[in-house]
Amino acid sequence: MEYEVVIGLEVHAELATKSKIFCSCTTEFGGEPNTHCCPICTGMPGVLPVLNKKAVEYAIMAGLATNCQIARYSKQDRKNYFYPDLPKAYQISQYDLPLCYNGYIDIEVNGQKKRIGIKRIHIEEDAGKLLHDQWEEGSLVDFNRCGVPLIEIVTEPDLRSSEETRIFLEKLKAILQYTGVSDCKMQEGSLRVDVNLSVRPKGSKEFGTRTEMKNLNSFRSVVRAIEYEAKRQIEVLESGGVVVQETRRWDEAKGITLSMRTKEEAHDYRYFPEPDLPPIIVDDNWIEEIRKRIPELPDQKKERYIKEYGLPEYDAGVLTSSNAIANYFEECIKYTQNIKAASNWMMGEIMRILNDRGLEPEEIVNIKIRPNQLASLINLVDNKTISNTIAKQVFEEMFETGKDPEVIVKEKGLVQITDRNVILEAVKQAIANNPKSVEDYKNGKDKAFGFLVGQVMKITKGKANPQLVNEILREELEKI
């Protein structure tokens, strides 16, 4: 029997506010444990929360950017459960009246557009963090994260594969970063993904029993976990078993999901309206004011790159997939007329060094090559000061040292040879040293010409102007 995978996501994104959702404590990441908290964060008796207006605005902005309806009236609710990192024994969240609902994000899979529904976006506070490796006798609790504002983005069960899920998450991450709603640093926990997954016979309309997967701290983990869990559930069904509705933990090292606990239902949390906070009232003027602050989003920027810069759709898609990459590219083309070359360098060498060093796209801001330096390198090639081959060598040194390309070219004597007489001598030497290749060329073997060009470049240490090498070499070969 052929099965279909059905996937829905719950994505938690930390909002980019400077202070927490119900108090003035900082949201800065990385402080000493329990130094960024106060009686409100830790739920001491007698304290009252005050809602951070900026958190609401960021949530509305996320809703507008994902085509959601914005609720004019919503409220906050207490979600009751016990866990050591939850000092109040309840989390302030939203239950039946979320701030944003009925949205969507369009993605492209194998050249086909697909719409993924956003069921709701609601605001809530984060819990603390358990530290398991700092005390031999047990676990410790760090309350710094308590009260950090989150949005939870809940999708409809519209995703059908790990690939669709990855593409959707990359698009969502880009939208949140473009709008400034969240920095989405997964390594710092500011973007966390829970995956709800079930399988059903292909063609069936009924949903299977779902499991929820947690501890997914990278998109690669999400993809691997989906592929493993789908296979596991299919094997259970085909062996006559029953899939248990439960929460499962992804074990990155072993590449498997492990049972954590049975899956809770809403009634298990005994939700009730938060008595210490008034309802959230949002009027049209406030929504329009926030809408005006939304910058150009990835899809809009992609269309502009295609129309304004004449870039291929694929290139435009890659360059706009991350706000940091797009900003780097736009800064680069302020200093060079050759937009296509800038795109090629970004798509080729820049992406390569990010991938080779395991850097996220947003970490492009930390590399030593500045956008204006990349533009200078492009200009050196365009004005024939250096060849493309030499430019790649210069690029590597720029990445390691941060030096300007002009400085590297001067220090290493890499200026392109354009003197015809010098190139002619190198051509004659290459011809004299490789009679077999000359004979092959005369017999119609085109590859022999490429080999001879390579020999000339080797003699000139890659510094000869390639166009002149081709021209002079052909002239000399015709004389033979």
Curated annotation (Swiss-Prot):
E.C. no: 6.3.5.-
Functional description taken from the UniProt entry: Allows the formation of correctly charged Asn-tRNA(Asn) or Gln-tRNA(Gln) through the transamidation of misacylated Asp-tRNA(Asn) or Glu-tRNA(Gln) in organisms which lack either or both of asparaginyl-tRNA or glutaminyl-tRNA synthetases. The reaction takes place in the presence of glutamine and ATP through an activated phospho-Asp-tRNA(Asn) or phospho-Glu-tRNA(Gln).
Family designation: Belongs to the GatB/GatE family. GatB subfamily.
Pfam families assigned to the protein according to its UniProt record, in alphabetical order: GatB_N (PF02934), GatB_Yqey (PF02637)
GO annotation, biological process: glutaminyl-tRNAGln biosynthesis via transamidation; translation
Keywords annotated in UniProt: ATP-binding, Ligase, Nucleotide-binding, Protein biosynthesis
Record SMART domains: GatB_Yqey
Catalytic activity: L-glutamyl-tRNA(Gln) + L-glutamine + ATP + H2O = L-glutaminyl-tRNA(Gln) + L-glutamate + ADP + phosphate + H(+); L-aspartyl-tRNA(Asn) + L-glutamine + ATP + H2O = L-asparaginyl-tRNA(Asn) + L-glutamate + ADP + phosphate + 2 H(+)
Assembly and oligomerization: Heterotrimer of A, B and C subunits.
Database matches in InterPro entries: Asn/Gln-tRNA_amidoTrfase_suB/E, Asn/Gln-tRNA_Trfase_suB/E_cat, Asn/Gln_amidotransferase, Asn/Gln_tRNA_amidoTrase-B-like, GatB, GatB_C_1, GatB_Yqey_C_2, Gln-tRNA_amidoTrfase_suB_CS
Ranges annotated as spanning the membrane: none
Leading EC class: ligase
Single GO term (MF): asparaginyl-tRNA synthase (glutamine-hydrolyzing) activity
HAMAP family registered for this protein in UniProt: GatB
Designated name of the protein: Aspartyl/glutamyl-tRNA(Asn/Gln) amidotransferase subunit B
